[in-house]
Amino acid sequence: MQRARCYLIGETAVVLELEPPVTLASQKRIWRLAQRLVDMPNVVEAIPGMNNITVILRNPESLALDAIERLQRWWEESEALEPESRFIEIPVVYGGAGGPDLAVVAAHCGLSEKQVVELHSSVEYVVWFLGFQPGFPYLGSLPEQLHTPRRAEPRLLVPAGSVGIGGPQTGVYPLATPGGWQLIGHTSLSLFDPARDEPILLRPGDSVRFVPQKEGVC
């Protein structure tokens, strides 16, 4: 059993955080726990993260300590959730103006730009959780050969649709924002559109594959 610790954060929330390692199996149990918590009357929101879950309480002043005890027990009882997974292909133009850090990643990894693209697009990724921005997917299973530290100095503006690598993870920026990930490409696919019936394109558990476009490195 993977050990966990619970603690208060701010004035309204409790966090359950797992010890390393980060695995898809433990992430599936976090999804199940979040699903269980969201229907409870004293829970405002249950937010799954990477190896953790944050629970916002309706009456924290009277429930927080009890919630810590119960969260620990519920984690020990939780089972994996196999969500209804969709397979989504994301077209990407690698390199060029939309992927200004492709050469940096290639140099760091000792690969050619073409090899970086081939590796990055060869994997079927899983959406572990959404965060940072509405619809920003944190994707697991980035090949270890592509792990690259974030930029020492974040950019003041990263365009929407930018595909990046940050340490052991890869993802796509749904909206323009400051950001520190290494940008290797750009997609025209909209990951967040408030005008859609479902504004957020991806959900935890979805499978994603990046498809190189002929306009870029491929």
Swiss-Prot record:
SMART domains given in the database record: AHS1
Keyword Hydrolase set for record: yes
Cross-referenced InterPro entries: CT_C_D (IPR003833), Cyclophilin-like_dom_sf (IPR029000), PxpB (IPR010016)
Pfam family for this entry, one: CT_C_D
Enzyme class: hydrolase
Reaction catalysed by this enzyme: 5-oxo-L-proline + ATP + 2 H2O = L-glutamate + ADP + phosphate + H(+)
Similarity comment: family membership: Belongs to the PxpB family.
Functional note: Catalyzes the cleavage of 5-oxoproline to form L-glutamate coupled to the hydrolysis of ATP to ADP and inorganic phosphate.
Subunit structure: Forms a complex composed of PxpA, PxpB and PxpC.
Protein name: 5-oxoprolinase subunit B
